[in-house]
Curated annotation (Swiss-Prot):
This is Deoxyribose-phosphate aldolase. GO terms for cellular component: cytoplasm. Pfam families: DeoC. Gene3D superfamilies: Aldolase class I (3.20.20.70). CDD domains: DeoC.
Length: 221
């Protein structure tokens, strides 16, 4: 298992500095991670830092971390991020709309980002710690219907992160052709392997180096 290629090497805290983004990108190049995941303000800089290796992508976040923006705002964010060099976007669904069973809005919200991305890879963040199993399943179904490429557990900014049980449910719901990303609380090799064994095809973590070197991080993301 080439574990590094599963990892989105992540730095999303508000206080993340330019020096920390520089280090993040250098580490991603060294370890050959799938991507760096950064806030939109750092996309252009990260793209410049990673231009020597087409295999290490720039991932950013949309409607993050609450998912409470309108579809139109999320679409604008998506276009702006791609113009700045983003290769992948991780959007947060409208969590309240899902809880209200306003499935038309949930789907329209996802589809707005998918259409704005125009072929750029889209991952849909559910914030599974806030959802029932039925809501997770419904979010996965709506993500597939709206044309998303991936479903993702968590922002890393709420009360819980990825669980093996949720990853398994998401994989069972979306089938074999959609990616599943585990994020939030994956801190070591054993945790990452458990997620992959349950069906994850990507791991979002700030602990990427610890994961691939057999160490452990205390980071929540």
């Amino acid at each position: 298992m080439e574990l590094a290629r599963y990892i989105d090497h992540t730095a999303l805290k508000a206080e993340t500095t330019k020096d920390q983004i520089t280090t993040l990108c250098a580490e991603a190049l060294e370890y050959k991670f799938a991507s760096v995941c950064v806030n939109p303000t750092w996309v252009k800089y990260a793209a410049e830092q990673l231009k020597s290796d087409d295999d290490v992508k720039v991932c950013t976040v949309i409607g993050f971390p609450l998912g409470a923006n309108t579809p139109e705002v999320k679409a604008f964010e998506t276009k702006d991020a791609i113009a700045n060099g983003a290769d992948e976007v991780d959007m947060v669904i409208n969590i309240a709309a899902l809880k209200d069973a306003d499935y038309d809005l949930v789907e329209r919200d996802i589809r707005a980002v998918v259409e704005a991305a125009n072929g750029t890879l889209v991952k849909v963040i559910f914030e599974t710690c806030m959802l029932t199993k039925e809501e997770i399943k419904k979010a996965a179904e709506l993500s597939v219907k709206a044309g998303a490429d991936f479903v993702k557990t968590s922002t890393g900014f709420s009360t819980g992160g990825a669980t093996v049980e949720d990853i398994r449910l998401m994989r069972e719901t979306v089938g074999p052709d959609i990616g599943v990303k585990a994020s939030g609380g994956v801190r070591d090799f054993e945790g990452a392997k458990a997620m992959i064994d349950a069906g994850a095809t990507r791991i979002g973590a700030s602990a990427g180096i610890a994961i691939v070197t057999g160490g452990r991080s205390d980071s929540d993301y």
